[in-house]
């Protein structure tokens, strides 16, 4: 990712998300992973995903630092892709209702000019590139992740971020995450612990 683009993103975050907040902390970031309708109550929704929605909304609203979002994004040929052949359930097709962020979170993202990273696969290399570029200009002490699904996209992005920023604390709040199943959620948390990712909220 070009340094000039990263710099413009960085200053956009400062000027728009800070918005007069005296306690705004530019060294702590929150990444909200794939809080989209299809993963909540759509084609791949679960009751566990629905349960965490109020907690995620509350955490985002109260967070005193930059907030970024990822959005799982597929095209109409999804079923022809490798992922589509392994998981033949259409979901998060660009432009559909199921692709959109949960309404309150979408409103927050638009109002606060949050960066939204559309990603065609589990992890976002653009997200990792962006935050590592920002870290070259200003230190990032912590990056916290919340969202869906713990065992697929949360763990993928947590490990990408830990790889990009090995000396930054990467945190996952388990109480604001849900997996494909409760057991796979727990398995992913244990795997992340082994990769020196801090797990809170269990």
What are these regions (language model features)?
Residues 116-156, 179-202:
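Conserved N-terminal glycine/acidic-rich loop preference
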Residues 7-25:
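Short, Lys/Arg-enriched N-terminal segments with co-localized hydrophobic residues
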